[in-house]
């Protein structure tokens, strides 16, 4: 028998020293290209719950209504086309996003919810298109970019993916990610590293994408993980400071809601989900552990040999 006790989160870390990964369009292309559901199913054997932010999905601060950047190769290819334009503007590589994303609502959403969401997004996209039309006079729309131009952009790009070779689940996830990125024309190389090699690579930033994870704190707090992502941004710092200085529960909830939306819009990292670890009990033992995030062994005094 087993009892779930410890919550861990796994995610993809971007190296922001890489000029390509500093570009929002490239990061969004990668985010849309990765099939996270496949990772949960095939790499983690469904032993995880898909989440979009480093908080337990049962936390009062987790925004279950926020639509993620779900697997969508059409969106991924569109963002690669947009990257051709944004990367060529050396003096104006602003993180402005006006690409018309296709619906990527979670499967759990009802058809009615999908229609309502799409109507709202389409209205917003039309406003963005009008706003972007002035800039288009100076150049082209992303829809005008050809596949050959995208190939030329990616010709010399190979992203190094590092993963701890002793974590079989993440190794499988790295393979899925590599295949997903290759499918949209992004070349990759996977480096399976020992524990000490992984630590050195992270410290020296000798990677482009890193598959890592950590235990979630007992108290719902995503600030530590967000700070470790290496995304240097004044607005993000503002949200994190607001969380630390919040004086009420409502203020914390509101700030977390805004922060989660911002992290998604900027594609700051890619979350796989929350993994369950277990305490395993021999069948000869009678009783039940009632462990929680604070005490893995809570209730062990009630366990007896049959």
What positions do the PLM features span?
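Append "and occasionally in soluble cytosolic enzymes with long acidic Gly/Pro-rich linkers
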Residues: 22-178
């Amino acid at each position: 028998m087993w009892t779930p006790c410890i919550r861990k989160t796994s995610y993809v870390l971007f190296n922001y020293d890489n000029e390509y990964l500093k570009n929002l369009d490239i990061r969004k292309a990668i985010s849309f290209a990765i099939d996270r559901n496949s990772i949960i199913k095939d790499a983690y054997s469904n032993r995880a719950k898909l989440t979009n932010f480093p908080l337990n999905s049962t936390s009062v601060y987790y925004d279950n209504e926020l639509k993620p950047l779900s697997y969508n190769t059409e969106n991924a290819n569109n963002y690669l086309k947009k990257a051709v334009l944004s990367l060529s503007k050396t003096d104006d590589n602003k993180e402005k996003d006006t690409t018309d994303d296709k619906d990527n609502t979670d499967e759990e959403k009802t058809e009615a919810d999908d229609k309502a969401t799409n109507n709202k997004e389409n209205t917003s996209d039309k406003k963005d298109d009008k706003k972007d039309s002035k800039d288009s006079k100076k150049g082209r729309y992303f829809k005008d970019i050809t596949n050959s131009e995208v190939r030329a952009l990616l010709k010399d790009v190979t992203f190094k993916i590092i993963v701890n070779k002793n974590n079989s689940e993440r190794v499988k996830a790295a393979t899925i990610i590599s295949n997903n990125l290759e499918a949209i024309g992004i070349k990759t190389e996977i480096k399976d590293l020992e524990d000490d090699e992984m630590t050195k690579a992270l410290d020296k930033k000798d990677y482009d994408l890193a598959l890592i994870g950590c235990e979630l704190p007992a108290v719902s707090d995503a600030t530590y993980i967000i700070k470790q992502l290496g995304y240097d941004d004044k607005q993000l710092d503002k949200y994190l400071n607001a969380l630390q200085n919040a004086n009420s529960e409502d203020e914390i909830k509101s700030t977390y809601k805004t922060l989660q939306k911002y992290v998604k819009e900027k594609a700051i990292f890619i979350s796989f989900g929350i993994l369950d670890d277990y305490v395993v009990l021999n069948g000869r033992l009678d009783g039940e552990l009632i462990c929680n995030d604070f005490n893995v062994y809570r209730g062990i005094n009630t366990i007896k040999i049959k």
